[in-house]
């Protein structure tokens, strides 16, 4: 307790790994607002992210069965700064780092695949177009 307020111990920094573009599933479609447009969807073995013209919606499956899902919404308007890190000699996975208002850090990693660079640039361009027009 801090100054009469209960402070939750929440991990504000998250890392999500993606490797390919896929069609939008019915489950995630129900989380999309009528006033936003889906641009594309990416996935890993368990997690998925929907990139719209307004936000990133990440479905983070929990536990060994993956039946429990935690949904993260990252509105583009809350991004303070962002950076692209390309693949190197020892670190083969490029990533986009997002710093959100409140100091939250989100890392979107793109696992080595033949379409990795195109997918990284697609995500970067979507964020960039929102941020600077």
Annotated model-derived regions:
Residues 115-133:
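Pleckstrin homology
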Residues 12-15, 72, 78, 120:
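A general marker of short, structured functional hotspots
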Residues 2-49, 113, 130-133:
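Anionic N-terminal interaction surfaces
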Residues 1-2, 64:
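Intrinsically disordered, low-complexity segments enriched in small/polar residues
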Residues 32-48, 52-104:
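Phosphoinositide-binding peripheral membrane targeting modules
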């Amino acid at each position: 307790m801090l100054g009469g307020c209960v402070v939750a111990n929440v991990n504000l920094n998250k890392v999500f790994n993606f490797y390919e573009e896929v069609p939008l599933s019915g489950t995630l479609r129900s989380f999309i607002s009528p006033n936003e447009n889906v641009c594309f969807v990416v996935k890993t073995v368990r997690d998925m992210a929907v990139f719209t013209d307004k936000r990133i919606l990440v479905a983070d499956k929990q536990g060994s069965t993956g039946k429990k899902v935690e949904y993260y919404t990252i509105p583009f308007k809350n991004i303070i700064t962002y950076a692209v890190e390309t693949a190197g000699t020892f670190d083969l996975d490029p990533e986009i780092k997002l710093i959100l208002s409140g100091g939250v850090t989100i890392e979107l990693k793109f696992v080595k695949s033949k379409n990795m660079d195109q997918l990284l640039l697609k995500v970067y361009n979507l964020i960039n177009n929102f941020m600077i027009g």
